[in-house]
Every structure is written in structure tokens, then in C-alpha cells.
Amino acid sequence: MNSIDLPSLAEATPTIRHDWTREEAAAIYHAPFADLMFRAQTIHRQSFDPNAVQCNQLLNVKTGGCAEDCGYCSQSAHHDTALPASKLMDPKKVIEAAKAARDAGATRYCMGAAWREPKDRDMAPVIEMVKGVKALGMEACVTLGMLSDAQAKQLADAGLDYYNHNVDTSEEFYSQVVTTRSYGDRLDTLAKVHDAGIKVCCGGILGLGEKPTDRVEMLRTLANLAQHPESVPINMLIPIEGTPIAATATPVDPIEFVRTIALARIMMPKSDVRLAAGRTAMSDEMQALCFLAGANSIFIGDTLLTTPNPGDSKDRQLFNRLGINARGELGVHVHSHG
């Protein structure tokens, strides 16, 4: 383990960098736990309220039948997961769901469709959804797969605020997870989204069989982009029967997960770090450590796409125990985002 110079941490400022090396990122990740947490919490407090958590709502507007072969995903047409494919939801029903989320305190709404990439004919109903959400006074986010420049511009013109497009893991490990697209394809879409003026939401998944080095490299890739993603969701794998990775997945050590959250906060000090999927398998104590390490955002509701989530009642109890700001219907500072 590498020791970190504590006096320098006390004077740490949230400097935005895009030139992190493998060696320094790894040294931070593997530092003594107390030193790592101190540095992450110090940086976190300089940009965020340490007692506030952003809450995000996510709706699956098109389920299953995806042409990609992501080894963890129940929505891939390549896997036998007994998940029926559905058509794109009626925009009116999506907007009704967004209104319910707004009435529960949400200010941002994310809509996900299980596509490799949207066809041009898909854009009109998606744009209707985006405009409908915006008309409710909410921010809008979508995740649709890869985009063309023209599609990114269409979404920007419709007023889209955020686009979610995760890199999942490191470039070195990526081919062990997905073979139907390249890591470069993901980065290319991120560039198109950024160039269109849409904010980027991009993170990854822990528990795919990756090594700690892969977690470090995933975050280093994001931190070294021309602009840091405005949101960085960190997911813990929920193994789904019928997916290839479920057969070989091993649980992520809780401390290793917390280290990843801390590294994300240190390397991307102004970004929201989202404690995303997998919270049903986390103890309250593990989640508390993640918040202490710099996580300032979660997903609310009973489900995330096709996987379970703790639900508002349980989250409210946790937030009350931790003294998290009591604002909004859930009892926290509420936004809604994917």
C-alpha cells in the first residue's frame, strides 16, 4: 500500500485535470483506506454539500431485443433471459410517468431504450418524449445506444439535457464483456454528444470479472476526456440468470467498491458520482461509506430498467439515519436522472 501525504490532502483543491497517469491513479486507489477517504471527502466538500444526495428516476421506454451482446445484460437478444421484447412506449404514457415522478419531487427524468442505436424513424417519438418532459419543467435524459451526429443534434435541438452512454469497464477488458461494438465506438458517441452541447452521463459496472487495474483505467479514461462527464454512475453487477457473465461473476469486495467511488470523486471533483445499480446487495453501512467517499447521487424507485432497487421507503429510512438533507418527497435534495 502507498501512503499519501496528509498535509497536502488538507490543502487539496478540486483542480480539474485531464492528464492522469496510470501510476498516480493506481497509487491513489491502493492508498491506505483512511488516507483515501480523507482525500475524497476533502475534495467532495469543496464542490458539494456532503449531506445532500441527488435522487434520479429511470424509466425503460423500450425493453429487450437489443442487438448488442453485452455479457451482463438481460435485454440482449443474444441471451436466453426470458425477458420479452417490447415496442417503444407511447410518448403520452412516458410523459404521464414523468409527471408522477415530478409530483414525487423529481426534477430530472431519464428514459432508456434497449437499442444498439436508434433508427431515424425512432427519433420522432423520442423527441416527443423529451419535449414532453421539458414541458413539465423537468430536465430530460435519454440513453439510446450509439448516435450519429445528426441524431445528437436532433436531441440537442429538442432540449435534451443529458445523454447516458456508459463505457462499462477498461478498454483492455472491454472485449471480455462486449464483442458487437468497440470501446472506440463508445468514445465516439460520447464525443458526438459533447459536441452537440448535451451533458454527458458515463460510468461503468463493477463485478464483471475485471481486476482493480481495470476499474482504475476505466475512471482514468473518463477523467482524461476533453471534458469530464457531468455524471458518473458506478454500478455493481446484479447477476441475471441466462447472461454469460452471471455464470462466472464473483461478488465485489465492498471496500474495493468504495475505493472506486473515492477515486472517481478525486479524479472528477466537479462531477456527480452516482451510486447506481446494485444497491439491493449493499448494506446500509456500505452505502454510507460510498457517500462518505464522495457519492452524491442515487437512483430511486423499486426497479432500474430490469433489475431491483431498494425503493423509496427504505431509502428514506437510510437517509434519515445518516442525516441527509430532508428536501423533496423522498426526504432528500431531489433530482431525477439516468
From Swiss-Prot:
Keywords: 2Fe-2S, 4Fe-4S, Biotin biosynthesis, Iron, Iron-sulfur, Metal-binding, S-adenosyl-L-methionine, Transferase. Catalyzes the conversion of dethiobiotin (DTB) to biotin by the insertion of a sulfur atom into dethiobiotin via a radical-based mechanism. PROSITE patterns: RADICAL_SAM. It catalyses: (4R,5S)-dethiobiotin + (sulfur carrier)-SH + 2 reduced [2Fe-2S]-[ferredoxin] + 2 S-adenosyl-L-methionine = (sulfur carrier)-H + biotin + 2 5'-deoxyadenosine + 2 L-methionine + 2 oxidized [2Fe-2S]-[ferredoxin]. It holds the Pfam family BATS. PANTHER family: BIOTIN SYNTHASE, BIOTIN SYNTHASE, MITOCHONDRIAL. Binds 1 [4Fe-4S] cluster. The cluster is coordinated with 3 cysteines and an exchangeable S-adenosyl-L-methionine. Binds 1 [2Fe-2S] cluster. The cluster is coordinated with 3 cysteines and 1 arginine. Pathway: Cofactor biosynthesis; biotin biosynthesis; biotin from 7,8-diaminononanoate: step 2/2. InterPro entries: Aldolase_TIM, BATS_dom, Biotin_synth/BioAB, Biotin_synthase, Elp3/MiaA/NifB-like_rSAM, rSAM. HAMAP family: BioB. CDD domains: Radical_SAM. Residues 51-270 form the Radical SAM core domain. Homodimer. The lineage of its organism: Bacteria, Pseudomonadati, Pseudomonadota, Alphaproteobacteria, Hyphomicrobiales. [4Fe-4S] cluster binds at C66, C70, C73. This is Biotin synthase.
